[in-house]
Amino acid sequence: MRTAMSNETKKTGSSFMEKLSTVIVDKRNLIFLLTIILLVFSAFSRNWVEVESDLTYYLPSDSETKQALDIMDEQFTTYGTAEVMVANITPEQAAALEPKIKEIKGVQSVDYDETTAHYNNLSALYSITFAYSEDDEACLDSLEAVKEYLSDYDLYVDTDLGNTQQETIDHEISVIMVYVAIVIVIVLLFTSETYGEVPVLILTFVVALVLNQGTNFLMGKISFISNSVTSILQLALSIDYAIIFCNRFKEEHRLLPLREAVIVSLSKSIPEIGASSLTTIGGLVAMLFMRFKLGPDMALCLIKSILFALLAAFIVMPGLLMLFGPLIDRTQHRSFVPKIPFVGKLDYATRYIIPIVFVVLAVIGYRLSSDCPYAYGYGLISAPKQNETQFAQQMIEDNFTSKNMLALIVPTGDYDKESAILDELGQYDEVDSTMGLTNIEALDGYMLADKLTPRQFAELAGLDYEAAQVVYAAYAAQHSEYGKLAGNLATYKVPLIDMFLFVCDQVDSGIVTLSDEQTQMLQDAEVQMNSAKAQLQGTDYDRMLIYLTLPESSDETYAFTDKILEIAEKYYPDENVYLAGESTNEYEFEKSFAVDNKVVSIVSVLVVMLVLLFTFNSAGMPVLLILVIQGCIWLNFSFPTITGKYIFFLGYLIVSSIQMGANIDYAIVIASRYQELKSKMHHRDAIVETLNFAFPTIITSGSILSICGFLIGSMTSEPVIAGIGESLGRGTVISIIMVMFALPQILLIGSGIVDKTSFSVPSITEKKSGHGKVSVNGMVRGNINGTVHGIMHATVEGDIDLNLISGSANEEQDDEED
């Protein structure tokens, strides 16, 4: 029966959703125009977003490491550096290169000697410091000049300068997106019922993707992880929305003309898809509560991407269905997705066995996942492929001992305390070396912070003693130390670095006159001292560098960082001291994870349970579904324990949230269908029909999400992103297996619990009556006197006389069947 709603139905009025859907469909040309404008805008604005590649940026603002990093940014200059290794070179050639590199414009210093720290295995390692801060583009120019000069050698460069890592990641993600697009097209062609629906779905995805990327700039700054994987995860997580709408449209279009079918299917899909998206959003909401702010950053990006996917499905896709409707009708084909009655029969036959097996597996998974080896830095994780920068780093690490440096920050003004701290730290085996103003040699065995009398300074600088006394007197006057002027200047002591820089100022002002040789010596010393002061002395704090013999990532290292702070606090009991470095960053990540892990787990379960509670109107069903998915999460993260492969802590938080929020949709599809069918037929038939119905949806969404995860895990050189992809792909496969081969049995034996914990929610009913041809869509109760044309999912109390075209019609027994 192809007809619109009857006149009587029109008289009684349409629902709000139908009115909204009608406006969307009828105004599709305007919507297309606005969408094109927004797409063009987004094509440009997608480049406006600032990408943050430093994970420490997202540390809690009250963490000690974050405060230390902020102080270093404000108070000290960090010059650009690079580790340059030249392989296959003799010691003589290596030594000859050092002065040549120093002569390159922009190179401030080159650290090289003939010890194994700089020459080993026929390779030379030059530690180059540039004359510009690490944020200055001039560093890159100087680095390129160094590379150009050494281009004839076997060269490997390790540096944090520039943004080559992000450029590499962007290129890799672009390649992955091409593969993902191919996978999506293949899966859609396989699972579709008409070829014409594929371009509709693809265009809907593209609109959502581009609009989401084009609005990232509104967030100001996003992490490199969010920038890299959000688009791929958006496609994988939100593909269900367009597919649900498309399937609903095809169902309605069997009875209704194109326009009416789109309107009715949209009005039904909005609440259905909206409810489906709530579980995914609910799982991501948990990350908003993390102290480590990378969680909220990624959660907001993913939630925004899902909202744009909903917007594209509800606003743009109806117009696309109208546009491609004739093509959809002409290109129908048989379904390539097979029926799987054997799975349902197997599940029914094993309903008393598999739940026990699942519980045992879940307990084992929980125990193993509790011992999951987490990494908090890059030292313990790796990607399946290496980019050029990582290969250079690996080559340098293979030939030379890597350095683990920490920066100790203390209040400025007391060189004696700083010297005592460095002396005490130097006694520990865990400390390889230290560097501060108090132990850097300046001239003739004197350290920068050594205090010199006028005579000592005169001998060191080659000044007349009388001239030195004049300079010391001027220094005392400038610093308001008038007691020194009145007393004996001969015993007045001033730190070498302070006096040298003061003399340089006086020479520039003309108060002190020096010979050309003295002036040159002073200028050379001034450059070195200003460099040291800029790096190690600020307005309020001084910085000391500590090089450890310990690895960056280990419990022993983390414990020793506490020991360093304990020693420093002994000398500054009433003042704040700070410690920063890769090891302290990782230690801070570990402490944040201890809290965030509990928060994410609890919040994600509570939010998803709340959504499921009102979806099923039962307290028992949410518990069963969440236990199944939580068991899948435990099993997923038991694999790193079994293989001994470290996983970045952030990957666990992100993937567990996505599993709880997205993979649970597979369980919802099965549970909803089974709840609908179990009262209409034997439980065995109900579970068989349920799996036949749910399999196309699960295999479509699940295969895309899992393949996307595995592609990310295998095709990127960024270890954190690779770990997220691998875990997501593995977790999705586990979830698919469990909802197909364990959840049905749990539903069969837990049906009584679900029924006993059910509750009813008062619903608003609308009285409808009509005569002639009436189109009915929805859950109804009442009497019908006439001939029925269409698809029924109903229980009829009374007499029926039907021609059964497809499906089944069975008389139900009064006693409930097992």
Model-derived features: positions:
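Short, hydrophobic beta-strand segments
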Residues: 80-84, 123-132, 368-378, 404-409, ...
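Extracytoplasmic
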Residues: 62-67, 74-75, 87-129, 148, ...
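Structural signature of multi-pass, alpha-helical inner-membrane proteins
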Residues: 4-9, 13-36, 43-47, 62, ...
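Glycine-centered tight turns that cap/initiate beta-strands
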Residues: 103-109, 152, 430-433, 573-576, ...
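Short amphipathic alpha-helices in soluble, non-transmembrane regions
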Residues: 96-104, 138-149, 420-428, 557-568
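Structural beta->alpha junctions
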Residues: 85-92, 127-135, 158-162, 381-386, ...
